[in-house]
Curated annotation (Swiss-Prot):
<keyword id="KW-0093">Biotin biosynthesis</keyword>
<keyword id="KW-0489">Methyltransferase</keyword>
<dbReference type="GO" id="GO:0010340">
    <property type="term" value="F:carboxyl-O-methyltransferase activity"/>
</dbReference>
<dbReference type="InterPro" id="IPR013216">
    <property type="entry name" value="Methyltransf_11"/>
</dbReference>
<dbReference type="Pfam" id="PF08241">
    <property type="entry name" value="Methyltransf_11"/>
</dbReference>
<comment type="pathway">
    <text>Cofactor biosynthesis; biotin biosynthesis.</text>
</comment>
<dbReference type="GO" id="GO:0102130">
    <property type="term" value="F:malonyl-CoA methyltransferase activity"/>
</dbReference>
<dbReference type="InterPro" id="IPR029063">
    <property type="entry name" value="SAM-dependent_MTases_sf"/>
</dbReference>
<keyword id="KW-0808">Transferase</keyword>
<keyword id="KW-0949">S-adenosyl-L-methionine</keyword>
<comment type="similarity">
    <text>Belongs to the methyltransferase superfamily.</text>
</comment>
<dbReference type="InterPro" id="IPR011814">
    <property type="entry name" value="BioC"/>
</dbReference>
<dbReference type="GO" id="GO:0009102">
    <property type="term" value="P:biotin biosynthetic process"/>
</dbReference>
<dbReference type="InterPro" id="IPR050602">
    <property type="entry name" value="Malonyl-ACP_OMT"/>
</dbReference>
<comment type="function">
    <text>Converts the free carboxyl group of a malonyl-thioester to its methyl ester by transfer of a methyl group from S-adenosyl-L-methionine (SAM). It allows to synthesize pimeloyl-ACP via the fatty acid synthetic pathway.</text>
</comment>
<dbReference type="GO" id="GO:0008757">
    <property type="term" value="F:S-adenosylmethionine-dependent methyltransferase activity"/>
</dbReference>
<dbReference type="GO" id="GO:0032259">
    <property type="term" value="P:methylation"/>
</dbReference>
Length: 251
């Protein structure tokens, strides 16, 4: 179990709500891959758990589904509602879903469960509110994600603003009591400069540490050091994400 400050996470994503869609390329790429595992596309009651500003809520609604958008961040829900992305909007925590058993045909959670204190509980909750014959689809980040950031930060006399993600084996263990199938993918994204890479993390609310929060501003000298040590190639300054996709069919 991880030590997670839910209020701080909600605030971090709340601050990012207005700019989230500009920086959410990873979420969209990951979500498109996750959607490929769906057995049905329309005519379902769908829960988007950890909906953010509702990009995939809108995707599922446009496909002909009744969508409930849930998020820990009130600001994200305001953004989702302003864009008319779903049919219902519900503040809530994935680890304590405010729904009855078997409420949805599809429980969808794209890059949200990594913020949970207890992944096993989160997966159990998603499974609980899924109807028999329905499906749970989720994606998350695993250990070694953002290793380029860790490597570049090491020479600096500062704590790296890198969240601690669970290793793949721990993710599998969290769902061992459930009919869970996992797939893995590594996605590497290039940025034109170090600031763009850092802003991509801040823009999606992902700079909050599970255990404490990095404080202080980066100096010009720090940025120069990061540029020297940050792994890069023809694509630019790199950030790699180790993605895990989970599929559960409700029995």
């Amino acid at each position: 179990m991880q030590t997670v400050n839910k209020q701080a996470i909600a605030q971090a994503f709340g601050r990012a709500a207005q700019s989230y869609n500009q920086h959410a390329g990873l979420q969209r790429l990951c979500g498109e891959e996750l959607a490929s595992y769906a057995t049905r596309r329309q005519g379902q009651k769908v829960l988007d758990a950890g909906c953010g500003p509702g990009w995939f809520s809108q995707h599922w609604r446009a496909a002909g589904n009744h969508v409930t958008a849930l998020d820990l961040s009130a600001e994200m829900l305001v953004q989702a509602q302003a864009l008319h992305t779903a049919d219902c909007y519900q503040p809530g925590d994935i680890e304590a879903l405010p729904f009855s058993d078997a409420s949805f045909d599809l429980c969808w959670s794209n890059l949200a469960v990594q913020w949970c204190s207890d992944l096993s509980l989160a997966l159990t909750e998603l499974y609980r509110v899924t109807s028999p014959g329905g499906q749970v689809l989720f994606s998350t980040l695993s250990a070694d994600s953002l290793h380029e950031l860790s490597a570049a930060w090491q020479p600096l006399d500062l704590p790296a603003p890198v969240n601690r993600f669970l290793p793949f084996d721990a993710i599998a263990h969290a769902g061992q009591h459930l009919p869970l199938t996992l797939m893995q993918q590594t996605l590497t994204v290039g940025f034109p400069d170090v600031l763009s890479a850092l802003r991509s993390l801040k823009g999606i609310g992902a700079t909050h540490l599970h255990q404490g929060r990095h404080g202080g501003l980066l100096s010009r000298r720090h940025l120069q050091q990061l540029e020297q040590h940050w792994p890069r190639d023809r694509r630019g300054y790199l950030l790699s994400y180790h993605l895990v996709y989970g599929v559960m069919h409700r029995e």
